[in-house]
Design a protein with these regions (language model features):
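Short, surface-exposed basic-aromatic patches at helix termini and helix-loop junctions that form
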Residues: 252, 271-280
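An anionic, glycine-rich sequence signature occurring as long contiguous blocks
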Residues: 229, 280-434, 509-583
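Basic, amphipathic alpha-helical segments enriched in Lys/Arg and hydrophobic/aromatic residues
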Residues: 461-482
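Short amphipathic alpha-helical "interface-anchor" segments enriched in bulky aromatics
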Residues: 430-458
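Short, glycine/acidic-rich hinge or "gate" loops at secondary-structure transitions
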Residues: 138-140, 257, 486-500
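Acidic, metal-coordinating catalytic cores used for nucleic-acid/nucleotide bond scission
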Residues: 235, 259-269, 287-290, 463-466
Length: 583
């Protein structure tokens, strides 16, 4: 058929100098020409002649037998069922489809999720014994090249594709109000080649060279929807503006999103930036943010103590105060602020009686011990007791120590008080629940730093760190998917009144997957079959909502090929039908 260009397989170069290599025919083409099953076909790339070698049946049998392997498969099979068809995997395929990067990244992410080990140097041994989406390119050098190939442009395209795929998957569900939790964490690094590493105080107030990671998590799914890396000496409060700018550049739709932030991001500048950019918010306002916050608490303090304002569902008293907030919608640097734009903010005041009572009990107990020690032997007072005695105790005219109740009451006045500010949430209970659910971003960070052992970068260049961070976020998303399935199962069990199925800890997904990873399968060229699965291990599959595996057929796309990320296109070229005219 002269002129035909239909692809029939791949050409694998065996000798780069002469261009001599072997043609690996596709399954579809071999179905058209079954006789090719009995031949190996070779060709000189520069010539049109084909060389056919008959396959020895005994040699072929031994070759196929050597391809039968026993692998760990339960955990990765379960992960395939969970992520398969998800917006995450579709976005991964859209952006990283070349040279099977999507499946290579997925296989590496599975390693992180199952092992909880961020040291990718151990991946090669794991890949040799585990059923994975992709099994080639597992050496340290190949992994390093893969990570360095991931640029900021890829990350932006991926996050954009993820939002689009999420929109397709959930459709009208996304028209409802969604809550995204924003927070950041510091990751230690002693590399001098990562540009974002700077000396700063981490979350434990320890000064060390570090890089910061900001994360935005969907509070419903627990999955990251946005992340970025920034300099280690940048304070939390100054990161919101850049985050909003990047979301706008990436054209991420947040019209129905409420951004939930903790006290580290509480500032009038951040509130105004979010209002200017159309990002609704719930912000935990520090009492020392400005005098107006303290004045509002004092003005409504009696209402907070009033039992009529107690909300049983959240077990706190709550009072909502609408205030008029004036700001510049289009500020001009260097010009005096006009504050001509007006918007209503809802300041929700909360009073937790239990916290106040517990703080009072601790202060009272500590003071009585300090006074007792003072009476027995003042010289033996500890430094902490001396401070307590100085701040909250007086001496009577006869030298007897007494508690100064006015000072003690002032100390406890704001104990148990929380202030949340929102531009859209008018109900105090709804606002409180939204803020409490920001625990999902804390779970994500615990997953990232503790569960996936990413408390250090473990790479030595900016290029590798960008790729490594993306891989860690991919693993965090998958881990959160598993975690949310366990959580949903437990909630259903509790509603039914049955015994709790699986205790949910921050690392519960790792423990469950570790048990599933001990389930083996036998893999051969035509497919795979699992060992018999019974009892408790069947229950584990049910907990995460996936069917118990049995047997399956190996798909064409799952088989090994010889494409590598650093191999030029002419190393693995399509063979056209017109090359076979002389057959």
């Amino acid at each position: 058929m002269p002129g035909s260009t239909k692809s029939v397989g791949k050409f694998i170069v065996l000798d780069s100098e002469t261009g001599y290599g072997e043609i690996i025919f596709s399954e579809e083409f071999k179905q058209q020409y079954p006789e090719l099953e009995h031949f190996r076909v070779f060709k000189n790339k520069k010539k049109r002649e084909l060389e056919f070698k008959i396959i020895d049946p005994e040699e072929n049998f031994l070759a196929n037998a050597s391809k039968v392997v026993r692998l760990h498969g339960g955990a990765t099979w379960a992960l395939n069922q969970i992520v398969g068809g998800s917006p995450l995997v579709k976005a991964l395929r859209e952006v990283f489809s070349d040279y099977h990067k999507d499946r290579r990244l997925l296989a590496l992410a599975y390693y992180l999720v199952i092992n909880g080990d961020s040291a990718l140097a151990n991946y090669e041994e794991f890949a040799e014994a585990t059923f994975l989406p992709y099994i080639r390119g597992r050496s340290s050098g190949a992994i390093s090249r893969l990570l360095r190939s991931i640029k900021k442009d890829h990350l932006s395209k991926f996050l954009n594709a993820l939002q689009k795929e999420t929109q397709k998957a959930y459709g009208t569900m996304l028209t409802e109000r969604r809550y995204w939790a924003l927070d950041s964490t510091s990751i230690t690094s002693y590399s001098e080649n990562i540009s974002s590493v700077e000396c700063g105080h981490n979350k434990d107030l320890i000064e060390a060279p570090q890089t910061n990671v900001l994360l935005v998590v969907d509070q419903t799914t627990g999955e990251p929807v946005y992340f970025r890396n920034f300099d280690g000496n940048t304070p939390d409060v100054s990161t919101v503006r850049n985050t909003l700018a990047e979301l706008a550049i990436m054209q991420i739709d947040y019209s129905n999103v409420v951004l939930v932030t903790d006290r580290g991001y509480s500032s009038s500048q951040n509130w105004e930036d979010m209002m200017r950019n159309g990002m609704s918010f719930v912000s935990n306002a520090r009492r020392n943010l400005n005098s107006a916050i303290t004045e509002l608490i004092n003005e409504h303090y009696a209402q907070l103590l009033d039992w009529n304002n107690y909300l049983d569902f959240i077990e706190q008293s709550a009072v909502t105060v609408p205030i008029a907030w004036r700001y510049d919608e289009f500020p001009v640097e260097g010009l005096r602020r006009q504050k001509q734009t007006k918007k209503t903010l809802y300041v929700h005041l909360y009073y937790n009686h239990s916290i106040n009572e517990e703080d009072g009990r601790r202060l009272r107990t500590a003071l009585f011990k300090a006074i007792g020690q003072y009476k027995a032997d003042p010289a033996k007072l500890t430094d902490a007791q001396r401070v307590l005695f100085k701040n909250y105790a007086d001496e009577a005219t006869d030298g007897t120590p007494t508690i100064n109740m006015q000072k003690a009451d002032q100390k406890l006045r704001y104990s148990g008080v929380r202030v949340l500010v929102s531009d859209v949430i008018t109900d105090a209970q709804e606002c409180h629940i939204a803020y409490e659910n920001r625990v999902q971003v804390e779970h994500a960070f615990r997953t990232l730093k503790t569960r996936l052992a990413c408390d250090r970068t473990n790479v030595h260049s900016t290029e590798a760190w960008e790729g490594k961070l993306f891989l860690q976020m991919l693993a965090t998303s998958i881990s959160q998917m598993v975690r949310m399935r366990i959580k949903s199962y437990n909630e259903e069990v509790q509603k039914s009144g049955r015994k709790l199925g699986y205790r949910l800890h921050y690392d519960s997904d790792r423990k469950l997957l570790a048990k599933l990873n001990n389930i083996y399968l036998l893999k051969c060229p035509s497919g795979w079959v699992f060992d018999e699965i019974s009892g408790h291990k069947k229950d584990l599959f049910r907990i995460i909502g996936v069917p118990v595996p049995t047997v399956g057929k190996t798909m064409v796309e799952d088989k090994e090929d010889d494409q590598e990320i650093d191999i030029s296109d002419d190393t693995s070229m399509d063979i056209a039908l017109d090359d076979l005219e002389n057959l």
